[in-house]
Amino acid sequence: MAGWIQAQQLQGDALRQMQVLYGQHFPIEVRHYLAQWIESQPWDAIDLDNPQDRAQATQLLEGLVQELQKKAEHQVGEDGFLLKIKLGHYATQLQKTYDRCPLELVRCIRHILYNEQRLVREANNCSSPAGILVDAMSQKHLQINQTFEELRLVTQDTENELKKLQQTQEYFIIQYQESLRIQAQFAQLAQLSPQERLSRETALQQKQVSLEAWLQREAQTLQQYRVELAEKHQKTLQLLRKQQTIILDDELIQWKRRQQLAGNGGPPEGSLDVLQSWCEKLAEIIWQNRQQIRRAEHLCQQLPIPGPVEEMLAEVNATITDIISALVTSTFIIEKQPPQVLKTQTKFAATVRLLVGGKLNVHMNPPQVKATIISEQQAKSLLKNENTRNECSGEILNNCCVMEYHQATGTLSAHFRNMSLKRIKRADRRGAESVTEEKFTVLFESQFSVGSNELVFQVKTLSLPVVVIVHGSQDHNATATVLWDNAFAEPGRVPFAVPDKVLWPQLCEALNMKFKAEVQSNRGLTKENLVFLAQKLFNNSSSHLEDYSGLSVSWSQFNRENLPGWNYTFWQWFDGVMEVLKKHHKPHWNDGAILGFVNKQQAHDLLINKPDGTFLLRFSDSEIGGITIAWKFDSPERNLWNLKPFTTRDFSIRSLADRLGDLSYLIYVFPDRPKDEVFSKYYTPVLAKAVDGYVKPQIKQVVPEFVNASADAGGSSATYMDQAPSPAVCPQAPYNMYPQNPDHVLDQDGEFDLDETMDVARHVEELLRRPMDSLDSRLSPPAGLFTSARGSLS
């Protein structure tokens, strides 16, 4: 009842609009006295196009009538007497009106409730941005549904007019035949006597004059009916075009844009069910009007009357055929896109769908769809209607599929499950363009027969641009091409033109979307992260994001030219960050344990005033996909330390958490979180003791300079010494202590050279898998790789 209470508070034009909703089809008194009952019924749960829901609609009609009768019976007194009669009359009237078509009652009440809600929302003027967005969307959908209701009513009106025209014309033909019969009777008068002939002739002449006058008037009436019907069809087609433009050029294009952004990690494009229901309603109404126009043409051919109608009907017939053609060709879409980075000799899938397949009898003769790969230039020629028949740029295996109709969902679609690109033919490259910048597209084409083969349409649709690679090493640069295209493609572009430059804030949005999707995290790029990226890209030291908002980024800056002073592009560095996080550090990033986007100087500034043992994790500048540890520890030599970066290869040997656990002098995660509180849940569990008599070795992260410090300390309890066993390491029998050689461990820049020792470590790890008594003394590992039982293998 809350809805009706709000509706009663409407004023001015809104109140007048609400009053127009009611009439003999549904009196406003019924809405008022049964407000609570009406608002509690499941009107939206009924599918108006499903005959099986008729029974539920009948129950609602019966319930409405019973509620009215009950309300009438409870009226007492003088005023109640009149209301009792009125409500009883309404109950009878509604029963008679909707008894044969209960679904129309549901349609009527839904229309009323939708418009009431719209008027109330407009009056309230929602103030929140989210509310405005949702309201705007619901408003648009409501407007579409209202237009469909209007189209249904005008189509029903022209159907009634057509029937009236047909009945009038049939009666006219009967009377015309009567006129011919009278003329035949005149010819027979010669056989009668003069007196009888004169008497009969006078009567026949009077009858003929009267009939011819009537025929002349009726001919004009018929012509007027025909013109009025053609004019109504013209108006209907104008409304149909407008509705179709909203659905195909606005709603469907927006869905395709969402699908494109989903390729960059944006939110899913959403279901096609609502769009399909709209397209199917369009198809039904268009087809009904086309059939009406054809019947009108048949009536004109049956009884030709000179006038403008033939030309008008020919025009509306051509118009409605164009409308059907646009609907069928535009609703042949790719529901599931092929991969946009497409590797040769690799299986891939795609799904195409016809959104009107269940309404125009297309599914009665299931069409076959063919997929071919074409170049960007071939796609341009195709859209210009140039002759490109049978031209392609490669060979796709398993590229033909028959569309299937799914009765339960009402969808007509073709699922390509096992396609494979056997070969690709590349075009001549332009300038500095690499093979990973060359764009192709998968062309899907078919032929649809509509309405029992009355109309046949050749349909084609292009996939989003794809970049073809032959080796996994090309994947990263190909992804950059796809990212740029998906993010910055403009509506209605020539294939596959994109801006060469975009504003930095636009690129930030695309990077953040891709980052969250790849890392599968809600923790996106912060303002500080974006400042760091801007500093890196523009080689600028400003720490204010606003300073970069007006700067443009070219494609060359993004992934063609190396960053100043480095041997990689901006995208290659950023992609390496995403890859290492995705493969190894998603939980640590989500926990906020990885600061990441800070350079060495910024790390120094953050740590300099922190207690010894405070550390942070940042992405390496020198190594793509590298993560380095920076920590504070005062010593005579220095007070800030940086380890040589770890990469994906290193983390596949020993996890980040275990490496941090090995280094006991790392105590606090910046700014002040205890290390074990953050990382202990990710430590590898301690292995059970061996049962075969052998002690199992463990790999342990060691920083040799700190091990030296530990040995020099002679057992002191300083927290920076690497004295405690790793959380993942069991105490083991002591080994001989080898002297450490730190000469190449910390470089001049204060970073540990992991690459120089990792191969040796792997070799020793392999040796340690053998029984200890079988190792020849000649296989002793190099100096500096073993520590005591408190240490471990580096």
Swiss-Prot record:
Q: Which SUPFAM superfamilies match?
A: p53-like transcription factors, SH2 domain, STAT, Transcription factor STAT-4 N-domain
- GO BP, sorted A to Z: activated T cell proliferation; B cell differentiation; cell surface receptor signaling pathway via JAK-STAT; cellular response to granulocyte macrophage colony-stimulating factor stimulus; cytokine-mediated signaling pathway; defense response; development of secondary female sexual characteristics; development of secondary male sexual characteristics
Task: Report what the Swiss-Prot or TrEMBL entry states about this protein's PTMs.
Answer: Tyrosine phosphorylated in response to KITLG/SCF, IL2, IL3, IL7, IL15, CSF2/GMCSF, GH1, PRL, EPO and THPO. Activated KIT promotes phosphorylation on tyrosine residues and subsequent translocation to the nucleus. Tyrosine phosphorylated in response to constitutively activated FGFR1, FGFR2, FGFR3 and FGFR4. Tyrosine phosphorylation is required for DNA-binding activity and dimerization. Serine phosphorylation is also required for maximal transcriptional activity.
Any Pfam family from its record, for instance, is STAT_linker
Checking SMART domains in the record gives: SH2 (SM00252), STAT_int (SM00964)
Molecular function in Gene Ontology: DNA-binding transcription activator activity, RNA polymerase II-specific; DNA-binding transcription factor activity; DNA-binding transcription factor activity, RNA polymerase II-specific; DNA-binding transcription factor binding; phosphate ion binding; RNA polymerase II cis-regulatory region sequence-specific DNA binding
Specify the SH2 domain's residue ranges.
589-686
| Gene Ontology CC terms, in alphabetical order | chromatin; cytoplasm; cytosol; nucleoplasm; nucleus; RNA polymerase II transcription regulator complex
> What are the Phosphoserine sites (modified residues) in this protein?
S128, S193, S780
Keyword Translocase present in the record's keywords: the answer is no
Supply the alphabetized keyword list.
Answer: Activator, Cytoplasm, DNA-binding, Lactation, Nucleus, Phosphoprotein, SH2 domain, Transcription, Transcription regulation, Ubl conjugation
Does the keyword rRNA processing feature in the UniProt annotation? Answer: no
- Which residues carry the post-translational modification Phosphotyrosine, per the record? Y90, Y682, Y694
Q: Which residue intervals make up region (Disordered)? A: 773-794
Cell location? Cytoplasm; Nucleus
Give the function comment from the record: Carries out a dual function: signal transduction and activation of transcription. Mediates cellular responses to the cytokine KITLG/SCF and other growth factors. Mediates cellular responses to ERBB4. May mediate cellular responses to activated FGFR1, FGFR2, FGFR3 and FGFR4. Binds to the GAS element and activates PRL-induced transcription. Regulates the expression of milk proteins during lactation.
Per the record, the similarity remark reads: Belongs to the transcription factor STAT family.
Q: How does it assemble?
A: Forms a homodimer or a heterodimer with a related family member. Binds NR3C1. Interacts with NCOA1 and SOCS7. Interacts with ERBB4. Interacts with EBF4. Interacts with CD69.
- Report what the protein is called: Signal transducer and activator of transcription 5A
Chain's gene name: STAT5A
